[in-house]
């Protein structure tokens, strides 16, 4: 099995190192990751400038081929597939921080898996709750390996990827979940530069309902959350009603 490993925290993150080294148990591994932090960039693809794709031996992957890209996580997957050959599995992470609920819409970690899935490759995004006193990437990587092995052996339906979140503590087990309403309520902080001109930081505080059976509910109770995510964003349940709503509409 050939496994492409990427992330959004950058190639020097301890999370991608743990994930990449763990994946060696499944076969041939190659790492393609951003050369700097790319958190919250979403599924952006770089089309207005050239990209650099450089081999690196300084990221701690040993004999695993590793490449750094001055682009987004999705860029990394595109270049990895086209320059290094099509993998059998794409894994992204392990992200420093959870990607729950509506986080998926801006997560670079999930975007790498989305790109893999859009190319028809079974793909998984892994994220770790960093609210604990110790970040146990090794334990998360053990679970990631077990999940990746199952997907590698049994496959995923076309157009479906997995979004996996690990709790801050040692996992009690694994639960298959649905997405929660977890999100960040944006806050805009205004400050002044030395010339007295305003500049802004966008921050946010976590919000959302902790409903039973959701990813947020599972992770907060110490379980590994595994959520199937579909590339098809159509609101199928609203199609018929929308036809009625728009009946007779014309300029």
Swiss-Prot record:
Pfam families to which the protein is assigned, alphabetical: SurE (PF01975)
HAMAP family from the UniProt entry: SurE
Cofactors required: a divalent metal cation
Keyword Metal-binding included in the entry's annotation: yes
One term under GO cellular component: cytoplasm
Enzymatic class: hydrolase
Family in the record: Belongs to the SurE nucleotidase family.
Protein name, entry field: 5'-nucleotidase SurE 1
EC number: 3.1.3.5
Binding note for cofactor: Binds 1 divalent metal cation per subunit.
InterPro entries found in the cross-reference section: SurE, SurE-like_Pase/nucleotidase, SurE-like_sf
Subcellular compartments: Cytoplasm
């Amino acid at each position: 099995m050939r496994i492409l490993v990427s992330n959004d925290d950058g190639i020097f993150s301890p999370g991608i190192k743990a994930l990449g080294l763990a994946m060696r148990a499944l076969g041939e591994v190659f790492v393609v990751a951003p050369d700097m932090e790319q958190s919250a960039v979403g599924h952006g693809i770089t089309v207005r400038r050239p990209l650099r794709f450089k081999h690196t031996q300084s990221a701690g992957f040993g004999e695993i081929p590793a490449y750094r890209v001055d682009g987004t996580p999705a860029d990394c997957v595109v270049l990895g597939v086209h320059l290094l050959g099509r993998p059998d599995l794409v894994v992204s992470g392990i992200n420093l921080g959870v990607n729950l609920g509506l986080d998926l819409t801006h997560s670079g970690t999930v975007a790498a898996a989305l790109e893999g899935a859009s190319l028809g490759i079974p793909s998984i995004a892994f994220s770790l709750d960093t609210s604990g006193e110790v970040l146990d990437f090794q334990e998360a990587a053990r679970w990631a390996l077990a999940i990746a092995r199952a997907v590698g052996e049994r496959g995923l339906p076309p157009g479906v990827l997995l979004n996996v979140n690990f709790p801050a503590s040692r996992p009690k087990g694994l639960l298959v979940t649905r997405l929660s309403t977890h999100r960040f309520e944006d806050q805009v902080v205004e400050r002044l530069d030395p010339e007295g001109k305003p500049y802004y930081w966008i921050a946010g505080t976590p919000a959302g309902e902790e409903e039973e059976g959701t990813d947020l509910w599972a992770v907060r109770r110490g379980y590994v959350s595994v959520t199937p995510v579909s590339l098809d964003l159509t609101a199928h349940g609203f199609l018929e009603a929308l036809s009625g709503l728009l009946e007779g509409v014309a300029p």
